[in-house]
Design a protein with these regions (language model features):
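Serine-esterase "nucleophile elbow" of acetyl-processing enzymes
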Residues: 1-48
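Short, glycine/acidic-rich beta->alpha junctions
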Residues: 20, 49, 122, 126
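Outer-membrane beta-barrel proteins
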Residues: 46-52, 56
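Alpha-helical cap/lid subdomain in secreted, periplasmic
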Residues: 54-167
Length: 167
């Protein structure tokens, strides 16, 4: 079985900064003697995680794979600019091309708790749609929160995760 992993820096581990040692996902893979494919990238949005996971499973065999996905914070976005995807989050902008700096500044000013709750509700549905897609592909999977749960989405209003989401 292949352990497919995606998420933000929590799923990537110390390697994001050129560190040494093993991430927790590497420990999981080692413990169960599994090969691993880790598509995690620091500061990833749910959009990037879903996009790259679907690309991976569309272009590679899904036979005998298990997906482990860690979700970051809900305000994060992915912007496509000149055929390059950029991870966007509050306070993280130095990697952006100059032509995106003004857009980023406007975006950052709009980020408050009410916008976070709104995005949390949107992402809740996007992640559930991805969960259903993985089920259609017959790919077993587990999702977990790296940062926090779905803010503003009451437990009784959350969709049925079929025991695939640890929140």
């Amino acid at each position: 079985m292949l352990l497919y992993v995606n998420g933000d820096s929590h799923s990537l581990g110390a390697m994001k900064d050129g560190g040494v040692g093993k991430s927790f996902v590497q420990h999981v893979a080692d413990n169960f003697d599994l090969p691993i494919h880790n598509d995690s990238v620091g500061a990833s949005s749910a959009t990037r995680i879903i996009r790259t996971a679907k690309e991976y499973f569309t272009n590679n065999s899904t036979d005998n794979s298990f997906a482990l996905v860690g979700w970051g914070t809900w305000e994060r976005e992915e912007w496509l600019y000149e055929n390059t995807h950029y991870n966007i989050m509050v306070g993280w902008y130095k990697h952006l091309p100059e032509k995106l700096q003004e857009r980023y500044t406007r975006w950052e000013l709009e980020q408050d708790y009410s916008s976070l709750v709104k995005k949390s509700r949107i992402v809740h549905q996007e992640i559930h749609d991805f969960h259903l897609w993985l089920q259609e592909q017959k790919i077993p999977h587990t999702f977990f929160n790296c940062m926090y749960n779905f803010q503003g989405v009451k437990t009784q209003d959350q969709v049925d995760w079929n025991n695939c989401y640890i929140g």
